[in-house]
Amino acid sequence: MKSLAGHVVKYGKHRERRSFARISEVLELPNLIEIQTDSYQWFLDEGLREMFEDILPIDDFQGNLSLEFVDYELKEPKYTVEEARAHDANYSAPLHVTLRLTNRETGEIKSQEVFFGDFPLMTEMGTFIINGAERVIVSQLVRSPGVYFHGKVDKNGKEGFGSTVIPNRGAWLEMETDAKDISYVRIDRTRKIPLTVLVRALGFGSDDTIFEIFGDSESLRNTIEKDLHKNASDSRTEEGLKDIYERLRPGEPKTADSSRSLLTARFFDPKRYDLANVGRYKVNKKLDLKTRLLNLTLAETLVDPETGEIIVEKGTVLTHQIMETLGEYIDNGLNSVTYYPSEDAVVTEPMTIQVIQVLSPKDPERIVNVIGNGYPDDSVKTVRPADIVASMSYFFNLMEDIGNVDDIDHLGNRRIRSVGELLQNQFRIGLARMERVVRERMSIQDTETLTPQQLINIRPVVASIKEFFGSSQLSQFMDQTNPLGELTHKRRLSALGPGGLTRDRAGYEVRDVHYSHYGRMCPIETPEGPNIGLINSLSSYAKVNKFGFIETPYRRVDRATGRVTDQVDYLTADIEDHYIVAQANSLLNEDGTFANDVVMARLQSENLEVAVDKVDYMDVSPKQVVAVATACIPFLENDDSNRALMGANMQRQAVPLIQPRSPWVGTGMEYKSAHDSGAALLCKHDGVVEFVDAKEIRVRRDNGALDKYMVTKFRRSNSGTSYNQRPIVHLGEKVEKGDTLADGPSMEEGEMALGQNVLVAFMTWEGYNYEDAIIMSRRLVKDDVYTSVHIEEYESEARDTKLGPEEITREIPNVGEDALKDLDEMGIIRIGAEVQDGDLLVGKVTPKGVTELSAEERLLHAIFGEKAREVRDTSLRVPHGGGGIVHDVKIFTREAGDELSPGVNMLVRVYIVQKRKIHEGDKMAGRHGNKGVVSRIMPEEDMPFLPDGTPVDIMLNPLGVPSRMNIGQVLELHLGMAARQLGIHVATPVFDGATDEDVWETVREAGMASDAKTVLYDGRTGEPFDNRISVGVMYMIKLAHMVDDKLHARSIGPYSLVTQQPLGGKAQFGGQRFGEMEVWALEAYGAAYTLQEILTYKSDDVVGRVKTYEAIVKGEPIPKPGVPESFRVLVKELQSLGLDMRVLDIEEAEIELRDMDDDDDDLITVDALTKFAEQQSAKQLEKEAESVVKEEAQDVVQEIETAEDRD
C-alpha cells in the first residue's frame, strides 16, 4: 500500500495531527512572552541597582554630608494577583532601600532602611495589574544611540555628507558640508560653526596640529581658510571657546571659562550626557579601524612596536585574510598617537588615537589618515575628544570614498526599549527630582539630628512610576478578547510613544518593510490605517539581546565540510549583513550537506543563487520570518499579503465561544501559542493529579508535596468576554512541568480554538451573499455553534453630597412593588435574577435641596415635627441592550476595610451575563482575510444539501476569491473536507505545508471526487444545481463586532450645550447625523417639509422641539418651527463684529430672536422629555398636596377653634 502523505506529530498530551512539514526543525520555539518577563527580571536584578548607583551618592553643596546607596529589597506583595483584581488595587511590592548618611566633619555614619513606595510587579503572564485592570507595557522601537553618517544632495546636484552623534540623553553633535566644501558642526541643533573651531576648543589650536591629526584634505583646507584668527590677544583655543559660547548662548557676555563649563556640561558630564552601554558599543563599532580599513591600500609600512618586525608592507591591499592577523595588533593599540591639549582646553587629559595612513580610492596619489578612537572602555558613558576626532576623520574619509553611509531604517540602527528599560528611564526621572529635594534639605536642616529618612521625599519617585503605568502611551489596557490577542499584545513593537515617532511625521520609509526585518519583525502583521508600519510584531523565533537589538537564529554551515550543523547562532541585523544565508527549504542530504550545488540565499537586500561552498548560515525554520498570529494561517504562501494581514489581525478579534473547537486544518502553532499566552493553566512541577473538579486541581508532586491550582470560572475579561477555564486532566493522570491542566477561553485540548469547523459551499444564493455577505444555516444558531458569553460590569457608588449622604436602599420614591421584586432588603439585585433593559439593579436615593415651604406646610411642621425627606431617585438601572442574568454582585464598604476613593461610603458592582447567539449583522471571517456579515439565517431544510443528505452550514460568494487573491481558503476548504472524512486533524505549517500534490493525495485517500467538488441539491425543490460546487470544511470565526453592540435608535435624548444639536454616537445616546449630501438627496426629491423638520424640530430649534413634543403627547397639530439655534449663533457672531444684523420675515417685519435669558435655561439644559414629564407629575402632585394640606389645615383650624370655645 502506498504510504500516506504527511506524518503524525503530537502536540501536548491530548492532540495528534498529521503534519505535512518536510523540514525538521533543529530549534524549539522560545518562550513567546520572554521579551516581557526577561526584561522585567533584568530590571529587578540589575536595572534598579544601576539607577541608584547613578544618582547616589548625593553630596550637599559644601561637601560635608554624603548620602550613599547600600542595598535595596522588595518585600512581600500586599495583595495576591486575584486580590488585587478584586479590590481594584495594584499588584505591587513595597520597595525598601538601605541608605547610609556620612557626616564628613564629625565622621558620624547613620544607616537606615527607607520605604520607597510600592512598586508594581509583573505577573507570570507578563502583565501588570494597575487599579484592578490588566495592563501591558508595549516595547518601543527607537533609533539607537551611536554615530551615524548620511549622504545628501544639495539643490545644485552637488553631493555632500552629514554626520550625527546621538546619545541616549544629552546634546546632539552634527557635522555637515556646504556648497563650498566647508565643514561645519552644530551643537544641539543651534547655528553652525566651522568644524575646526570645535577642534581648537578641544585644545588643538594651531593649524599645523590640525593638519597633523587629520592629514591633508580639500574640505579641511577650505574650513581652515574660513576660520580666521580674529583677536590676537586670545589664544586660538580661547577664541574657539568664545565662538562656540556665542552660538550656544547668543547675547550673553562670552568668556573662555563660561564656555568651558558649558561644553563640559553638554558633553563630558556623565549626569547630563549618557551614551549608555549600547551607544558606546555602537560608537566603537562604527569607528573601528578593522572594518574601515578593509580593501584599502596601505600608504605606510606597519611595524610591531614590541619586536620591530614588519607586519604589513606599504602598498599592500588589506584583504579579509590580512585583516585577520592585523586585527589583533589594532586591538592592542597599533600606531597609537597621544596628543596633549593646551592648558586652556575643555578637557585637559591627553587624547590617544590610532592613525593609519592609506591611499585614497578617489585619487591614488593622495594619502589619507584613517583615525580610530582608541577603543574607550565600556564604562566610559560620555563622548570623549578621541570619539569626536575619530568621527570627524570618518566624515572626511567619506569624501575620499572610504567608509559607508548608514541606513537609519536598518534594524542594526534601531533598537528595542522593553519594559525594564522604559521603567528604568521613568525611575531615573523620579530619582533626579528627589535628588534636588535631598540637596535642599541637607543645607536647611540641622546636621546633628539628620537621618536618611528625613532627607528623602519619595513623592516624586512614586508619582513618576504611577504616571508611567497610568498614562504613558506605552502602558496599554490589555487586549483580552482571546488568548491570541493577549499574546500578540505582549509581543508588540511600537515606534510611537515618548522619544519615538509621531503618526503625522512618520514618512513612507520608516513604515516600509526592510530586508533587515527578516526573522526579526513580521512583514505582515501590522494595523491597517494611520499606524501601518509603525506598530509591528516580533517574529516567532526572534530574541532581544542585552543591547536591545533584535536577533534571529541561524544554523551554522561548516565551510570546511560543507555540512549544515545543528549549532545555532543568534545574529543581529548588522552582523548578518556580512554573511550569506541560505533559505530554510534548501534540500539537505542525510549527512547534512546541501543536496544541490547551487542554493537560493540572501546577502543584505539581494536574493541570489549561490554555490554551496559560499554559504555561511541557513535559516532554522520557514516560519521564523513571520509573527505568531501570521504563523497560525494555513496555506499562507498561497495568500496575497494584504489579505494575510487582515487574516492575522482578525484572528485577534475572535470572540471565545461556548464550545470551542480547534481547527481541523491547523499549522502546528496552535498548541505553542495557547500554551504561552497566559490563558491556559499550566503545571509547575511533575506529579500525579490527585483531585480535579471545575474549581480546583490538586497535583501531588513526586517529592510528596501538594500543589493546588485554582481554576478561573466566568471572569469578565478586559474586553467584556467571558474568561473561563476548563480542566482537561483526569484523576490519576501523570503530569509534567509545563503541561496544560486546564484550557482557557478559546482553547480546546490545549490548542488555540478561535472558531468552528463548518461545512462551506462556494455558491451564490438568490443574491443574499452579494458583496461578501454570508448565508448561514439555522443549525448553527440552534446547536449553539457560534454562541458566546459576554459579561458586563455596572457599578453604583454611594457618596457624601453637600446635602447629606446618598443611601443605597429599597425605599425608592415613585417606584412600584413590581420593580422591586428582585431586590434584597438593602435594595441590591439578587444573584441569578433575569433583568431586562431599564430594570433596577441597585436602589439609591440622593438628598434633594430642601424646597421653600408654604405657610400651611410650615404650620404642619411646627405641629407634627415631620421633616420633609426630599430625595431623588438615582438608582442604577440596566442600560439599553444590557439585559441578561445577574452573575455576581460585589459590595465594598468602609466598615469592611475596603479602600474606597474619598467621599465614597459604599460601592456596589453588578455583573450581568449575556448569552449571545449568532445573529444577522454579526461579522464573521476565515483565516485568510475573507470577512463578511451574516445576511440571512435560513432554515436547515432550505439549505442546499450534499448527495448523502447533509445540509451545508454556510454559503460564501465565489466572487470573493479571484480578485482578492487569497487562494489559501480554497486549499483549506478541500483539505478540511478530506480531514473531516478521514476523522483526523492536520498541520500544514507556513511556507512548509501541504503542496498541491499532498492536498490531492489526501483528497483521494478520503475517497472524494477527483476535482474535490460535488453535486449540490436545492433544499427547497430537491433539484440538483446546474454545476458541480466546491464544498468543504473551513475554519470560520465570529468577530468581536457584533450587531447587538452597534444597533442603536433614539427618539429624543441629550443635546450639546453649545450648538443645541443632538449628541452623536451610541455611548452618548446620540442621533444620526444628517449631513450635507443627505440634504442634497431630500432637495432632489423636493421634500421641503421633511427637510425643514429635520433641520429644526429634530435638531436645534430649542423652543420648537419642546412644543412639538407637547403637541404629540396631547394629540394637537404640530406648531410651526422656530429659528434654529445655529442660525441664532451666526447672527450673534455677526453682531459681535459690530454689524447690525436683523432677521425679517416676508412682510419685512423683524423676527425676534430668543435671548439666552433665565426663562429658557431649563429648556436649554434639560432633556425636553424628562422636563415635560417632571412638569406634568409635579403639577399632579401639587394639586394632590394642596387638597391634602387644605383639608388638614382646616382640621387644625377647627381643632383650635373648638379648643378656644371650650376655654
Curated annotation (Swiss-Prot):
It catalyses: RNA(n) + a ribonucleoside 5'-triphosphate = RNA(n+1) + diphosphate. GO terms for molecular function: DNA binding; DNA-directed RNA polymerase activity; ribonucleoside binding. The keyword Protein biosynthesis does not apply. One of its GO terms (cellular component) is DNA-directed RNA polymerase complex. InterPro entries: DNA-dir_RNA_pol_bsu_ext_1_sf, DNA-dir_RNA_pol_bsu_external_1, DNA-dir_RNA_pol_su2, DNA-dir_RNAP_su2_dom, DNA-dir_RNAP_su2_hyb_sf, RNA_pol_bsu_bac, RNA_pol_bsu_CS, RNA_pol_bsu_protrusion. Signal peptide: none annotated. PROSITE patterns: RNA_POL_BETA. It is an enzyme of class 2 (transferase). Its EC number is 2.7.7.6. GO terms for biological process: DNA-templated transcription. It comes from the Bacteria. Keywords: DNA-directed RNA polymerase, Nucleotidyltransferase, Transcription, Transferase. DNA-dependent RNA polymerase catalyzes the transcription of DNA into RNA using the four ribonucleoside triphosphates as substrates. Belongs to the RNA polymerase beta chain family. The RNAP catalytic core consists of 2 alpha, 1 beta, 1 beta' and 1 omega subunit. When a sigma factor is associated with the core the holoenzyme is formed, which can initiate transcription. NCBIfam families: PRK00405.1 (NF001616), rpoB (TIGR02013). This is DNA-directed RNA polymerase subunit beta. The gene is rpoB.
